Amino acid sequence: MAPTSAFLTALVLLSCNAICSLGCDLPQTHSLAHTRALRLLAQMRRISPFSCLDHRRDFGSPHEAFGGNQVQKAQAMALVHEMLQQTFQLFSTEGSAAAWNESLLHQFYTGLDQQLRDLEACVMQEAGLEGTPLLEEDSIRAVRKYFHRLTLYLQEKSYSPCAWEIVRAEVMRSFSSSRNLQDRLRKKE
């Protein structure tokens, strides 16, 4: 399988502490963005995840093959940007608008948009400092394929409430799991 930990690599850096420790000067408000996104995802839950257990699927979360020790700062931040972009696109579909509370979804979009703008400058800054290519093509492809699988699943399940719950939980679990890579990146410094 293609390098798949690009997903968690990217999500690790959603917290300000991880990004700031990597030398990127983001606004202090960015430090709360990761926590706020997780809180909003939790609040968006409309049905019990237990009622959807038979709908679960292995989406091949891109976290197993991408070694955290080999990730460079600029690459990790570029992956964060890609993950945020893909998450934004996933939750911006017409089916998403019908599935979630409009106010919570708007807050989620707004937070993702702000993080994307903050990271764009950060990615360029880190790429210039390291003088390295921003992303291995396999890593970016793994992230895109992962989100494509989530999108296909939603289509296959006709954007059902359980399908959205599975996708919401998948994204939330990945956001939460990202702290492991954050620790590895901090130890590298």
UniProtKB/Swiss-Prot annotation:
Keyword Membrane carried by entry: no
A molecular-function term among this protein's GO annotations: type I interferon receptor binding
Pfam families per the UniProt record, alphabetical: Interferon
Signal peptide: 1-23
UniProt superkingdom: Eukaryota
InterPro entries: 4_helix_cytokine-like_core, Interferon_alpha/beta/delta
Principal location listed in the UniProt entry: secreted
SMART domains tied to this protein: IFabd
Keyword Signal assigned: yes
One GO BP: defense response to virus
Cystine pairings recorded for this chain: C24-C122, C52-C162
Subcellular localization: Secreted
Gene Ontology cellular-component terms listed: extracellular space
PANTHER family tied to this protein: INTERFERON ALPHA-5 (PTHR11691:SF60), TYPE I INTERFERON (PTHR11691)
Family stated for the protein in its record: Belongs to the alpha/beta interferon family.
Summary of the function given for this chain in its UniProt record: Produced by macrophages, IFN-alpha have antiviral activities. Interferon stimulates the production of two enzymes: a protein kinase and an oligoadenylate synthetase.
Protein's recorded name: Interferon alpha-1
Lineage: Eukaryota, Metazoa, Chordata, Craniata, Vertebrata
